[in-house]
């Protein structure tokens, strides 16, 4: 019996975090955190949401460039780590803006309370 969609997404998230921060690590941008992985029902695509600790615009674009440049290597390394599925999904990396949005809302609420 195969893994459920949620368990597989969780496993992919864990493995991608290790692969990105160990195998393709770039000291200029620092730590990249994989926040969420969403799989399509047919498991052909995985939307991988990530944030970086240094969220200045030049570092965001550098992180996106490094991830895109190494996407095939990341997928290959993921395939070596996860062997109990037939096909590794195509990875689509998306910068996660939800943390920034949450901070923005928090600042608005703090301004209202003053």
Curated annotation (Swiss-Prot):
Sorted alphabetically, which keywords does the UniProt record give?
Cytoplasm, Ribosome biogenesis
A single Gene Ontology CC term: cytosol
Q: Which SUPFAM superfamilies match?
A: Ribosome-binding factor A, RbfA
Q: Which GO terms describe its molecular function?
A: ribosomal small subunit binding
Subcellular location, record wording:
Cytoplasm
Which superkingdom is the protein from? Answer: Bacteria
Q: Name one GO biological process term.
A: maturation of SSU-rRNA
One Pfam family this sequence matches: RBFA
Family, similarity comment: Belongs to the RbfA family.
Write out the function statement from the record: One of several proteins that assist in the late maturation steps of the functional core of the 30S ribosomal subunit. Associates with free 30S ribosomal subunits (but not with 30S subunits that are part of 70S ribosomes or polysomes). Required for efficient processing of 16S rRNA. May interact with the 5'-terminal helix region of 16S rRNA.
Q: Quaternary arrangement and interactors, per the entry?
A: Monomer. Binds 30S ribosomal subunits, but not 50S ribosomal subunits or 70S ribosomes.
Q: What is the designated name of this protein? A: Ribosome-binding factor A
